């Protein structure tokens, strides 16, 4: 019995659109960005193609339709990822990280959070909304490199701690993150929203006592660096 892997007409159409975008819009910019020694400037050069990808529904298409997303399937998403990766894997990562940052809200957020955060992501009139995923950390004390299975004296995996300021009714995050995705935003002042994995129970290690915090762009006391 054979399996037919031929894409149906609608996905073939999507593939052609994604391929045309990658070849005609993305590739010329990638050639210039690859020559830029400053990594942040090279990242900023991707903003133009990103805005076009947003208009095509590639940046937020995986989000639920009821909150303004495209509600596309995993196969649709991978078609777009494959075509953009063929030209520049880094750009495909920018798109996919939006999912890492926003899908936890779609899965676990309250109705209010979904409408607030996902609604903002899918209705940006400037077509440049960026979500960040902030997990890994530099090794050291505190720190953990996001290795949840490491056994040591300090809590393993995540060293950034979030403490509740009861007076203000908000959490204060302390620590450093390393290799976060999209988190600096287009201008190193922060993505529109970052999902930051933190430890809310410092006495517990491994996978226990962890929480995901939604952090707005450029919160007080937060410094982003491309180095």
Question: Residue spans of the language-model regions?
Answer:
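Short acidic, glycine/serine/threonine-rich loops at helix termini
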Residues: 73, 106-109, 143-153, 183-187, ...
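N-terminal glycine-rich flavin-associated loop
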Residues: 92-114, 141-144
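Short coil/turn connectors at secondary-structure junctions
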Residues: 56-58, 89-90, 100, 125-130, ...
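Amphipathic, small/basic residue-rich leader segments at the start of a protein or domain
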Residues: 1-95, 115-116, 120-123
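A short core secondary-structure module
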Residues: 169-223
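A generic, well-ordered mixed alpha/beta core segment in the N-terminal half of proteins
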Residues: 105-122, 126-135
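A gly/ser-rich beta-alpha-beta helix-loop segment of oxidoreductase catalytic cores
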Residues: 129-164
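Long, well-ordered alpha-helical segments
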Residues: 18-28, 112-116, 171-174, 212-222
């Amino acid at each position: 019995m054979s399996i037919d892997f031929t894409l149906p007409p609608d996905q073939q159409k999507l593939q052609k659109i994604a391929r045309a975008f990658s070849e005609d819009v993305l590739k010329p910019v990638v050639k210039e960005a690859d020559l830029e020694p400053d990594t942040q400037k090279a990242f900023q050069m991707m903003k133009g193609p990103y805005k076009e990808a947003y208009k095509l529904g590639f940046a937020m298409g995986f989000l639920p339709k009821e909150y303004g997303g495209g509600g596309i399937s995993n196969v649709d998403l991978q078609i777009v990822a494959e075509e953009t990766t063929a030209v520049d894997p880094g750009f495909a990562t920018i798109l996919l990280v939006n999912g890492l940052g926003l899908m936890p809200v779609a899965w676990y957020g309250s109705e209010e959070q979904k409408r607030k955060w996902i609604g903002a992501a899918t209705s940006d009139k400037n077509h440049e909304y960026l979500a960040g995923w902030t997990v890994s950390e530099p090794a050291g004390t505190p720190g953990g490199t996001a290795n949840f299975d490491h056994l040591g004296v300090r809590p393993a995996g995540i060293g950034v701690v979030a403490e509740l300021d009861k007076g203000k009714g908000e959490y204060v995050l302390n620590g450093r993150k390393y290799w976060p995705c999209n988190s600096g935003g287009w201008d190193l002042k922060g993505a529109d929203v970052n999902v930051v994995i933190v430890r809310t129970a410092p006495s517990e290690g491994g996978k226990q006592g962890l929480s995901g915090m939604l952090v707005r762009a450029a919160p007080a006391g937060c410094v982003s660096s491309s180095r």
